[in-house]
Amino acid sequence: DGISINNIIDKVKPDEIYNFADQDHVGWSQDIPLYSYSTTTLSVIQIFEFLKSKNKKIKYFQPVSSNMFGLSEENSLKEDSILSPASVYALAKSSTYLASKMYSTIHNLFICGAIFFNHESPRRSDEYVTKKIIKGVCDIYNGKKDFLYLGDISAKIDWGYAKDYVE
C-alpha cells in the first residue's frame, strides 16, 4: 500500500530505488486485473508522487516488459516502437512506462528504466516453461513420470538470465 511504501522510503532515505516488485504473470493478470494493475502501475505512481513532494533527488529505476509491444511485426523493437498491449499485464507495464516518462519530464524526477525481454532465474515458479522442463526431466529421471507435457510450444521467444539483467 502507498502509505507503507512512503513510510519506508521516508525512514530509509535511500539515494536510489530499484523497483522489481509487481505481479509478473501474464495469465494471472487476466484473472485478477485490478490487483495486477494496482501492483504494477498504481504503486509506482504512488512512489512518484512521494518523490515529487518529498525528495526529488532520489534516483529511481523502473523495469518494464517487452510485452507492452504486443505481437509486433517489427524485427527490432525500440523505445519508440508502437505500444500494443494484448493483456492486462502488458497494459499495466505500458502505463508504468508512460508514467515514468511523464513524471521524469514534467516533474523533473530522475527516473530511468529498461525494457526487459523474457528472463529466467532459479527463483521462477514451476508454472514457467524453463522450470516445467527442468522439473519434468527430473521427474522422468527419478521415475515419477513417463513423459513431459508442455502445452502450446508454438511461441518463439528468446530468454535472458535475470541476474544478467539486474547487473
Annotate the PLM regions.
Residues 1, 10, 15, 22-24, ...:
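Acidic-enriched, low-complexity/disordered segments with a strong bias for Aspartate over Glutamate
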Residues 1-119:
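N-terminal Rossmann-like NAD(P)+-binding domain of SDR-like oxidoreductases, especially those catalyzing
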Residues 74-75, 98-166:
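NAD(P)-dependent short-chain dehydrogenase/reductase
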